[in-house]
């Protein structure tokens, strides 16, 4: 499957990295890599996330981080909708 990031998801990832980087640049890079690696695995395993709170979405927990990736699947495409901090509702 092809992975496509929405503009919102790209902005979310950039924002969280910039925020973490203010306090710990190494941690910011580590978190961004963890998110990107986990998202890449959706190409082979698009059903690995749990059913989302919003209809027709799935939520992928990023291990060892407080982040969740919300995504949808349509035909052969996984669309990354947003990246959320678990404290956000």
Regions found by a protein language model. Give the residues of each.
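Basic, Lys/Arg-enriched alpha-helical interface segments
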Residues: 2-57, 74-77
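Enriched for short, Lys/Arg-rich terminal
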Residues: 62, 66-68, 72-89
């Amino acid at each position: 499957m092809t992975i496509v990031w929405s503009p919102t998801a790209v902005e979310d990832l950039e924002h969280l990295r910039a925020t973490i980087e203010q306090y710990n640049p190494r941690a910011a890079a580590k978190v961004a890599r963890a998110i990107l690696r986990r998202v890449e695995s959706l190409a082979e395993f698009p059903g690995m996330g749990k059913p989302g709170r919003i209809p027709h979405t799935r939520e992928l927990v990023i291990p060892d981080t407080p982040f969740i990736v919300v995504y949808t699947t349509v035909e052969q495409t996984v669309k990354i909708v947003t990246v959320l901090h678990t404290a956000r509702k």
